[in-house]
Amino acid sequence: HPSDTYYIIGSTVGPHPYPDMVARLQSVISEEIKKQLLEKEGRDHPDYLIACVGGGSNAAGTIYHYIDDERVKIVLAEAGGKGIDSGMSAATIHLGHLGIIHGSKTLLMQNED
């Protein structure tokens, strides 16, 4: 019921502490990267990390344990869909407009509805 519940989106958006909670929960991604690299390569860090930045949870989890590691180059990519001028794009950083989602002011892809 809206008067006693709150929907928490699974993205790194909204007021604190929700983005931090999502990032910490998704940090299992970078834990697994460290574990597999150590097993297969004998080191726990990659040269590069590449992640998509849609809602942010995948990227946050991927870089979580490497964010302060200067040995790792981090590359974040935004989905372009069929191009920014196609009308079929999810390029929020490029095409988004300020809006409110879950009490947080951020860039959004939205229409009048």
Model regions: which residues?
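Glycine-rich phosphate/pyrophosphate-binding loop at beta-loop-alpha junctions
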Residues: 5-7, 15-113
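PLP-dependent aminotransferase-class I/II
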Residues: 1-3
